[in-house]
Regions:
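Eukaryotic nuclear low-complexity, Arg/Ser/Gly/Pro-rich intrinsically disordered regions
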Residues: 2-12
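Short, flexible turn/loop "capping" segments at secondary-structure junctions
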Residues: 19-23, 84-88
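Vicinal oxygen chelate
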Residues: 31-37, 94-150, 158-180, 185-192
Length: 192
């Protein structure tokens, strides 16, 4: 038996009859795209991911030296349209940032590019920005609070919340000092 099954965490509300090893995680997500250049402009030029491999009909991007965090291809979807509402499929992919300051940087990048958010939330466990990529794929850009700060009920189960996110504070978090006014609000030096 692996010792990773003993890693601390929240108490599950339902335990699988034969639980998977707790060290298992999602390695990457591979998505269909209608237009590789358009998707590259968003993920690389705006969000700042690095291109690690490219083929005429596929693009692989990553952060932090990983082989690829996200893959995109036009094998079955070149020029295609997103699935219509009311169909099953991907709701969103969460891209987790290591610090609140790096999530603030992502928010500032989106603002500079005039890219719209569909929602923001403080879930107690993490702060989240919601948006759709150019192909309509749902994204959650998020930063996890330390696990010791996650809200739990009396039985140790997660108690997710939907609190108002301090967007102004997040915008200013980690911003260069010359871009933060005396009230602590981010004032962009320029827009892209």
């Amino acid at each position: 038996m692996s010792t990773t099954n003993q890693r601390p965490g929240v108490t599950p509300r339902e335990v699988a009859p034969r639980s998977i090893d707790r060290g298992v995680d999602i390695g990457h997500v591979h998505l269909k795209t209608a237009d590789l250049e358009r998707i590259k402009q968003f993920y690389v030029d705006i969000l700042g991911f690095d291109v690690v491999f490219r083929m005429p009909d596929a693009l692989f991007i990553a952060a932090g030296g990983y082989h690829h965090t996200l893959g995109f291809n036009t094998w079955e979807s070149k020029g295609g349209t997103p699935p219509p509402p009311g169909t099953t499929g991907l709701y969103h992919v969460a891209i987790r940032y290591p610090t609140r300051a790096t999530l603030g940087d992502a928010l500032r990048r989106l603002v500079r590019a005039d890219y719209s958010l569909s929602g923001v939330n403080d879930h107690g466990t993490h702060e989240a920005l919601y948006l759709n990529d150019p192909d309509g794929n749902g994204l959650e850009l998020c930063w996890d609070r330390p696990q010791s700060e996650w809200p739990l009920d009396a039985e140790g189960h997660l108690a997710f919340g939907n609190r108002r996110l301090d967007l102004a504070g997040l915008m200013a978090e980690g911003a260069p000092s010359e871009e933060v006014d005396s009230a602590g609000h981010w004032q962009p030096a320029h827009r892209a």
